Amino acid sequence: MAQPGPASQPDVSLQQRVAELEKINAEFLRAQQQLEQEFNQKRAKFKELYLAKEEDLKRQNAVLQAAQDDLGHLRTQLWEAQAEMENIKAIATVSENTKQEAIDEVKRQWREEVASLQAVMKETVRDYEHQFHLRLEQERTQWAQYRESAEREIADLRRRLSEGQEEENLENEMKKAQEDAEKLRSVVMPMEKEIAALKDKLTEAEDKIKELEASKVKELNHYLEAEKSCRTDLEMYVAVLNTQKSVLQEDAEKLRKELHEVCHLLEQERQQHNQLKHTWQKANDQFLESQRLLMRDMQRMEIVLTSEQLRQVEELKKKDQEDDEQQRLNKRKDHKKADVEEEIKIPVVCALTQEESSAQLSNEEEHLDSTRGSVHSLDAGLLLPSGDPFSKSDNDMFKDGLRRAQSTDSLGTSGSLQSKALGYNYKAKSAGNLDESDFGPLVGADSVSENFDTASLGSLQMPSGFMLTKDQERAIKAMTPEQEETASLLSSVTQGMESAYVSPSGYRLVSETEWNLLQKEVHNAGNKLGRRCDMCSNYEKQLQGIQIQEAETRDQVKKLQLMLRQANDQLEKTMKDKQELEDFIKQSSEDSSHQISALVLRAQASEILLEELQQGLSQAKRDVQEQMAVLMQSREQVSEELVRLQKDNDSLQGKHSLHVSLQQAEDFILPDTTEALRELVLKYREDIINVRTAADHVEEKLKAEILFLKEQIQAEQCLKENLEETLQLEIENCKEEIASISSLKAELERIKVEKGQLESTLREKSQQLESLQEIKISLEEQLKKETAAKATVEQLMFEEKNKAQRLQTELDVSEQVQRDFVKLSQTLQVQLERIRQADSLERIRAILNDTKLTDINQLPET
């Protein structure tokens, strides 16, 4: 009765241990489901990347559409240039036809102008003489009238001022008036002499006109010779424009054909992109469905397997492992040979020119076909883990990890990426800037062996030139939290097994038919995992086709750039020829403009001088008349002031007598007191002071007015003398300039006509130059846009390559994580079965001691 107690204790402890192991298994299953969810999240991220790539393609299409619009703009500019060339040709023919007519017309106009100028000069001289005589007669009569009126006024003043004390001032004024009359007589006499001098100058002006006619004939002959020399240059320019027109037409035809081809290629690429989108969606759905079915099959197998069936599975696995080991050895040899060949080919591929891009694409397709064979064996490992022993060397494990990184089944093989990296080795290094966040949490679950030291990880390089960063190496090498938890549970299991072991009361068994059905399901699941997806292969083919089209598009862009350079060279030649012609025309126009400007300046100066003289003469006359009127007014004001003073004196005398009589008539009462008398005296004294100050002020004011009037009269006399002198000088200058002005008028008219013709030709040439400059600027802008579009396309291409490499590494990591979890679950099931079948506690301890693991790669092969 005492024995059941101790025996039941180990039984309970073993049952607890088994329950703990079952809990651990359930936790592993939950971790596996969590990793599946994370893998689905990665799939969603990949889908987002795919949509981003689709948006990039749309942007590229927009860039291509903009280039097409620019090409249409260039075509319109070409048509405008052709129209301008035709206009230039028509202008040249019209100028040749109308040149002689213009010369004849100029000669005829010149003769008519000379005759009209001679007639005008004669008429103006006659009119000027007649007007001058009339003016002299009028001035004589005016001065006679003025003299008579002055004499009358002087007599009147003498009569008025005979009573006063200012007789001396009146005599002085009379003397001054007589002097003024004498000065006016002296002015009239020289003007008669000047009329005779003007007649002499008129004859001299006629002689000058004849000399100018001879000089005009010489200038016209020189102009005709210059026109003949310009005609040859114009013919050469027209010939050059014809050749340029033919070349530009050919270029336009070529550009039109190439644009049609580019549009066709763009439409094909759009269709292929849509097809690729649908195929990728289908492939994604199929992959998820296969993963779901695989997990369901694995769960069913875990439920029904027994220890005997597990042993049979182990035997089958050993056979499969031997076959896999043989295949791996063969593949390693093949990879070594391929690496040696690639090392030999690297300098050759780096020296390839851009014309060999199509050959590189064909090599990519061959390498794709050669590397697809390694996909099936690695995909089959999802269900049956690889059976490499623990004793394989570090080098073998490194090569195995490298081979696993090279395998792919969805985004293209590593060979295509390698060829791309060799062709574009200057861009592939940007992939090394990826950080750990780009790979997600699945990177930490990769089953890289601890035997991979830092040097081996640092030397690990993807075939496409993809380098892992230090952070990524640490993330791959480090243990995930799930792995740490698993290791801790296993260590706790081994340390806690100290009690005796009693085999469980019973375990689950299956029949032979069920076992055969399970074997068939396992075989079918392995075939499903090993079978390659048709959607993925179609996707790879479409991706290769897109790459070929991309290379063709680059070739077309290069051809278009070459044609654009040729067009720019031709445009530069045309601009040089045009610049030379413009320089010649500009030089001739500058010479003629200098001559015209000099003559115009002379004519303007003469006209301005004539106008100034006429204005000065008229102003002098007006000033003299105004001064005479002012003198008359001042004299009248003085006489009025004398009359007013006389009246004031009379009125003051009358007012004084009136006030005296009024004061006498008033009853004046003397004050009685001394104070009142004193106040009255003070008041009268103040009144007397005020009256005296007022009288002094009036006296000073009258004296000041008299002095001011005297000074004003003297100033007016001086101003009158100065005006007479200036008028005399201006009359002489006017006589000198009249002859020169009449001769310059005809010359000015002729120069204006020539200036108008030259300005019209200059405007036409400047318009042509502006149109050609606009064409050049538009072509330069088109070239800049094409180069920018090319750079953006290349940048997008390399970004897509980097994305593909990153997604490939994520896919490889997720596949390895799934394999490791399957391996771990199978190992735990085997260990549980072995514990159930163990006969003693020593056997259980030995089994648990074998399960002290720190890494997933240390699990024994089942």
From Swiss-Prot:
Gene Ontology biological process: apoptotic process; endocytosis; Golgi to plasma membrane transport; membrane fusion; protein localization to ciliary membrane; protein transport; regulation of postsynaptic neurotransmitter receptor internalization; vesicle-mediated transport
Q: What is the effect of changing V822D?
A: Strongly decreases RAB5A binding affinity
Q: Which InterPro entries match?
A: Rabaptin (IPR003914), Rabaptin_coiled-coil (IPR018514), Rabaptin_Rab5-bd_dom (IPR015390)
- Phosphothreonine sites (modified residues): T408
Consequence of changing E815K = No effect on RAB5A binding affinity
**Residues recorded with modification N6-acetyllysine:** K282
GO CC, sorted alphabetically, is: cytosol; early endosome; early endosome membrane; endocytic vesicle; endosome; glutamatergic synapse; intracellular membrane-bounded organelle; protein-containing complex
What's the chief localization of this chain?
cytoplasm
Q: Under the GO molecular function aspect, what terms does this record hold?
A: growth factor activity; GTPase activator activity; protein domain specific binding; protein homodimerization activity
Pfam families according to UniProt: Rab5-bind, Rabaptin
According to the record, the residues making up region (Interaction with AP1G1, AP1G2, GGA1, GGA2 and GGA3) are 435-447
PTM section of the record: Proteolytic cleavage by caspases in apoptotic cells causes loss of endosome fusion activity.
Location relative to the cell = Cytoplasm; Early endosome; Recycling endosome; Cytoplasmic vesicle
Annotated region Disordered: the residues are 315-338
Q: Which residues carry this modification: N-acetylalanine?
A: A2
Tell me the impact of changing D820K: Strongly decreases RAB5A binding affinity
Coiled-coil features, chain-numbered ranges = 11-345, 534-816
Q: Which UniProt keywords apply?
A: Acetylation, Apoptosis, Coiled coil, Cytoplasm, Cytoplasmic vesicle, Endocytosis, Endosome, Phosphoprotein, Protein transport, Transport
Instruction: Report the superkingdom from the record.
Output: Eukaryota
Q: List the disulfide bonds.
A: none
Which positions does the record annotate as the modified residue Phosphoserine? S374, S377, S407, S410
The UniProt-reported impact of Q818W is: Strongly decreases RAB5A binding affinity
Self-association and partners:
Homodimer when bound to RAB5A. Heterodimer with RABGEF1. The heterodimer binds RAB4A and RAB5A that have been activated by GTP-binding. Interacts with TSC2. Interacts with GGA1 (via GAE domain), GGA2 (via GAE domain) and GGA3 (via GAE domain). Interacts with AP1G1 (via GAE domain). Interacts with AP1G2 (via GAE domain). Interacts with ECPAS. Interacts with KCNH1. Interacts with PKD1 (via C-terminal domain) and GGA1; the interactions recruit PKD1:PKD2 complex to GGA1 and ARL3 at trans-Golgi network.
Query: Record's family?
Result: Belongs to the rabaptin family.
Protein purpose: Rab effector protein acting as linker between gamma-adaptin, RAB4A and RAB5A. Involved in endocytic membrane fusion and membrane trafficking of recycling endosomes. Involved in KCNH1 channels trafficking to and from the cell membrane. Stimulates RABGEF1 mediated nucleotide exchange on RAB5A. Mediates the traffic of PKD1:PKD2 complex from the endoplasmic reticulum through the Golgi to the cilium.
Q: Know the name of this protein?
A: Rab GTPase-binding effector protein 1
In which organism is this protein found?
Homo sapiens
Gene name, per UniProt, is RABEP1
